[in-house]
Structure formats: structure tokens, C-alpha cells
């Protein structure tokens, strides 16, 4: 059959074009067999302006950080100096086995003013009598030692179970004394519930984070007895509404950066609710017009966070995103690759930048009863 095509092709220039295209398709198919989609990492041919920013326009308070190895505190301070970061809040002050005391002691030995620590309640004790009251007492003791806030990890409402085998909801009344105590002490609750929307949808050809979920199957919370993302967020919102005197900071843009319209509605509804941008510039930067309008409108309610160990190179990606109008920025160095897209800078006004970088955080942190 190939011989017939070649003979026929000699008689007609138009058919020579057809043969070339047919050969190209066949060649492409052969090459494609050697490249998996997960291995495909195309390099853009765009030539666009790149602004190099190593220092922010205003000093930074990173209110969402994880300091990791405590012996690296000196290195972290060096990275902070290099990146113009004045204060970092570590969210790793776990109350289990009183680990927060070690974290506090180490942090304060290097810099009491620059390395702050939040307290993470021990949900494993949920079945103990008077758990909430007792944990609230431990929190007050921790605040007297220097703890400046509370951190809620995503396991609450998602994987933590009590002795009945049921998942403990975020708005479980047993936890009310903890939220109330935060209000009394005037310390914030950094609350992370649920995860990206894609992690709660089927892992199929329509999932925009398929490659991540294929590499990390445990990141998927679709089905298998997990509550829906919507239900978890509703639980959190009921807590915020019930405890109006307590400040809640919604980690990762309130855990719904894919829908800033809804996040804006929450901010309108709950005056005690704030959000931070940590590890979500990949979501914000693919909707730059909407994100810019959001940041300007809610400039008094947005905080800066990175969600990583202090790293000057990672901070520079955040600064470039917030301060410039650069196009097609690779967000991966700011945290890790989240989705197969690049982002666009928001070029925020200086008065907005200063609030996001430090002023909003200062108001919250400086309100604490114990400092």
C-alpha cells in the first residue's frame, strides 16, 4: 500500500503534501510514545521583561512559616536579613508532649522579637474529659511563656477522629473553650481547613492538578468517607460567626483562592476574619485582574505568608508577584509547582503593599495580652 501511495504521489503535487503530513503524524506518534505527559516540562519561548527584586519595598512580617529544623535558626535569620523580612511566625509549636516549649526556648534564644511561635492544640486528647477547658488552660500558660497565636492544621475536620470513629468537625462544641480563650488573650487563630478544590474532585482527565495527585495520591480527599470541601468550610465559618471576639486568619486565602468572590463575601460577613496569601500565588496570579481588585478592596484584611522555611530566593518570587507587572512568572520557586500554569504580577499600590507586608499583621500581633 505504501508503494501505491508513492507512485500516486509522483503524479500530483497536492498528494505530495498529503504524504508529508501523513509521515509527520506517524513520526509524531512514534516520538510521543517515548514521552509521558507527567514528564513533559515545556520551556516557554516567550521573551518578556523580568524584574529582579531581592528586597521588598517595605519590611515584611511573614505570618505563616514553618521553621523546620530548630538548629538552623541562625541560617534562617540570615535569610530573613537578606530578604528584608523583619519577623517570622512559626506555626510549629505543637502542644503534644509540650513540644512548643522547646520551640519557644530555641526561638527566643536567637531572637525573641523576630521569631514568634504559634500553639497547635493536641487533638489526640479530644476524648479526655473537659478536653476543651483543659487545652484552653494550657494555651494560657503557653501565652504567658511567649506563644503569640494558635495554629489549626487541616487534619481537623478531615482526618482527626474521636473514639466513636467519627471525624471531629471544625465546629465541634468541645473546642469552643479554645476559641473563646484566644479571644480573651487577644491572640489570633491561623486556621487551615480543607485543601485545593482539585483535591476534592475525581482524579481523572478533567482534574487540573492531576499530575500532583498522581505523584501524591494521599493528597486526594475525594470520596472514601471524607467530608466535602464545602462542608468543612461551612463548619469553619460557623466557628468564626460564633466567636466574634476572636480573630481568625484563613490560611491559603481562606482555603478558597479559586473563588475570590466567595472569599470576599466571607470578609464582608465576618469582621473578625482575615486571609493570608501563603503558598497560593499560583492561584492568585492566574487571575491577576480579579486578584488585584480583591487586594485593593480588602487591603486591610490580607496578610503576607510564605509557608516555607525562610528563603531569600522564595521571598523574591512573592515580591515580584506583588510589586511588578511582570508576565509569565514561574511561581514554583516561591513554594512548589502547583498546576501547569504561570502567573502575572499585580503591581499593587504602595499603600496596599505596606498593609499586606506588615501593617495588618502588626495590628493583630500587637493586640496580645501577653507579649
Q: Model regions: which residues?
A:
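N-terminal secretory signal peptides that target proteins for export/translocation
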Residues: 1-14
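Bacterial N-terminal signal peptides
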Residues: 18-29
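An N-terminally biased module of ancient metal coordination in phosphate/nucleic-acid-related enzymes
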Residues: 33-113
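Active-site gating/metal-coordination segments in enzymes
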Residues: 34, 51-53, 101-220, 271
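Alpha-helical scaffolding within the catalytic cores
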Residues: 45-48, 71-76, 97-107, 133-138, ...
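Hydrophobic faces of well-ordered beta-strands that scaffold small-molecule active sites
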Residues: 61-65, 87-90, 115-120, 150-152, ...
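Acidic-and-aromatic substrate-binding clefts and catalytic sites of carbohydrate-active enzymes
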Residues: 65-74, 92-100, 124-133, 160, ...
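H/E-rich (His + Asp/Glu) clusters that bind or coordinate divalent metals
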Residues: 224-225, 229-371
Amino acid at each position: 500500500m505504501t508503494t501505491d501511495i508513492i507512485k500516486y504521489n509522483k503524479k500530483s503535487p497536492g498528494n505530495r503534501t498529503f504524504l508529508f503530513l501523513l509521515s509527520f503524524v506517524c513520526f509524531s506518534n512514534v516520538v510521543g510514545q517515548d514521552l509521558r505527559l507527567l514528564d513533559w516540562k515545556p520551556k516557554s519561548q516567550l521573551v518578556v521583561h523580568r524584574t529582579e527584586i531581592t528586597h521588598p519595598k517595605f519590611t515584611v512580617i511573614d505570618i505563616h512559616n514553618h521553621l523546620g529544623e530548630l538548629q538552623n535558626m541562625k541560617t534562617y535569620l540570615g535569610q530573613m536579613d537578606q530578604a528584608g523580612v523583619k519577623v517570622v511566625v512559626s506555626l510549629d509549636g505543637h502542644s503534644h508532649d509540650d513540644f512548643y516549649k522547646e520551640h519557644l526556648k530555641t526561638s527566643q534564644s536567637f531572637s525573641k522579637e523576630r521569631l514568634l511561635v504559634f500553639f497547635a492544640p493536641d487533638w489526640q486528647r479530644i476524648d479526655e474529659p473537659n478536653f476543651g477547658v483543659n487545652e484552653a488552660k494550657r494555651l494560657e500558660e503557653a501565652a504567658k511563656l511567649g506563644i503569640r497565636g494558635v495554629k489549626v492544621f487541616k487534619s481537623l475536620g478531615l482526618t482527626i477522629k474521636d473514639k466513636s470513629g467519627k471525624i471531629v468537625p471544625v465546629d465541634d462544641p468541645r473546642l469552643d473553650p479554645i476559641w473563646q480563650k484566644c479571644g480573651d488573650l487577644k491572640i489570633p487563630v491561623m486556621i487551615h481547613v480543607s485543601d485545593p478544590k482539585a483535591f476534592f474532585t475525581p482524579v481523572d482527565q478533567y482534574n487540573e492538578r492531576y499530575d500532583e495527585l498522581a505523584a501524591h495520591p494521599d493528597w486526594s480527599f475525594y470520596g472514601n468517607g471524607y467530608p466535602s470541601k464545602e462542608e468543612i468550610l461551612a463548619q469553619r465559618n460557623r466557628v468564626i460567626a460564633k466567636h466574634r471576639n476572636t480573630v481568625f486568619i484563613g490560611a491559603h486565602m481562606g482555603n478558597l483562592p479559586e473563588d475570590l468572590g466567595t472569599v470576599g463575601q466571607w470578609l464582608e460577613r465576618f469582621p473578625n476574619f482575615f486571609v493570608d496569601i501563603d503558598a497560593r500565588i499560583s492561584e492568585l496570579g492566574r487571575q491577576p485582574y480579579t486578584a488585584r481588585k480583591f487586594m485593593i478592596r480588602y487591603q486591610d484584611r490580607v496578610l503576607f505568608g510564605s509557608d516555607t522555611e525562610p528563603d531569600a530566593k522564595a521571598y523574591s518570587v512573592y515580591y515580584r508577584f506583588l510589586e511588578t507587572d511582570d508576565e509569565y512568572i514561574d511561581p514554583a520557586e516561591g513554594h512548589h509547582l502547583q498546576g501547569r500554569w504561570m502567573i502575572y504580577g499585580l503591581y499593587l499600590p504602595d499603600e496596599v503593599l505596606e498593609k499586606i507586608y506588615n501593617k495588618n499583621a502588626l495590628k493583630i500581633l500587637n493586640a496580645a495580652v501577653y507579649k
